[in-house]
Amino acid sequence: FNKFGKARLYYEALSFEEQDEIYAYTKRNVLPTLTQMNLKYAISAKNRARTVAGVSILSTMTGRMFHQKCLKSIAATRGVPVVIGTTKFYGGWDDMLRRLIKDVDSPVLMGWDYPKCDRAMPNILRIVSSLVLARKHDSCCSHTDRFYRLANECAQVLSEIVMCGGCYYVKPGGTSSGDATTAFANSVFNICQAVSANVCSLMACNGHKIEDLSIRELQKRLYSNVYRADHVDPAFVSEYYEFLNKHFSMMILSDDGVVCYNSEFASKGYIANISAFQQVLYYQNNVFMSEAKCWVETDIEKGPHEF
């Protein structure tokens, strides 16, 4: 594939009908592909080598055709937590920060870093990201179509064959950095970890010591929805989302994020702080996040340290 140059050539060489045929084929068959690991060549302050995974053009083409509507709508929407596609120029950065700290009482900024994010990501969470990105296809695709698309995605970017240094290996999992949906899937993963940390924090609170009755009620309903319920209650999901949006405002770009949270609530344990994230990463991501990778900024005027 690499003998002929760039991907543009394939898009020009294949007619739209042929591209559609390949796409339709992936809804009833699995196309296993090869991924090539390359050393990244960049000027960097850090003294370390990074690798990028280049996935096959077939995987990229069909994957983009499947996810395009969802990805385009994420990239085109302004004023939402995931800021992929938002410009930082023309006052965009100022706009994002103002939206982040809006309506949060006693605000504090914090950020963190996922160590070895794309290598340590659990396979089930990468699959969940695929499912979340494909959730809008319930009207146009049958269950079989969607299952085959998921199987394709797993065979192409989750546990595919990797060519590295002239040898072939089976990748045990993790996310491929050259996949068409990498940034979006990482954003879903980021939200998943943040919500997990918040759920754990609120569940770990002593219910008898919560003075705020609305939060005590929220904790009780959260408990029954997590441990007792046999179906998802959309009303409660949106209510908890509103609670997090108000007291734990996030700005997300792939695996990077800034949070503006209510420091009073965090000190009482109603929402997550850095230590809650450390715990979640330790048992849900199998990595230890050191304090040096995190930052907390109590002075809102200074803005985030790094994003």
Curated annotation (Swiss-Prot):
Residues of the Nsp12 RNA-dependent RNA polymerase domain: 1-307
Uppermost EC category: transferase
Source domain of life: Viruses
Function statement: The replicase polyprotein of coronaviruses is a multifunctional protein: it contains the activities necessary for the transcription of negative stranded RNA, leader RNA, subgenomic mRNAs and progeny virion RNA as well as proteinases responsible for the cleavage of the polyprotein into functional products.
UniProt-listed Enzyme Commission number(s): 2.7.7.48
Domain RdRp catalytic stretches: 107-269
Protein name: Replicase polyprotein 1ab
Reactions that this protein is recorded to catalyse: RNA(n) + a ribonucleoside 5'-triphosphate = RNA(n+1) + diphosphate
Disulfide partners: none
Pfam families: RdRP_1 (PF00680)
InterPro entries to which the protein is assigned, alphabetical: DNA/RNA_pol_sf (IPR043502), RdRp_CoV (IPR046441), RNA-dir_pol_C (IPR001205), RNA-dir_pol_PSvirus (IPR007094)
One BP term from GO: symbiont-mediated degradation of host mRNA
Region listing for RdRp Fingers N-ter, in residue ranges: 1-76
SUPFAM superfamilies: DNA/RNA polymerases
Active site: S254, D255, D256
Region entry RdRp Fingers C-ter, spans: 116-174
Family membership: Belongs to the coronaviruses polyprotein 1ab family.
Region (RdRp Palm C-ter): 175-307
GO molecular function: nucleotide binding; RNA binding; RNA-directed RNA polymerase activity
Segments for region (RdRp Thumb): 307
Species annotation: Rat coronavirus (strain 681)
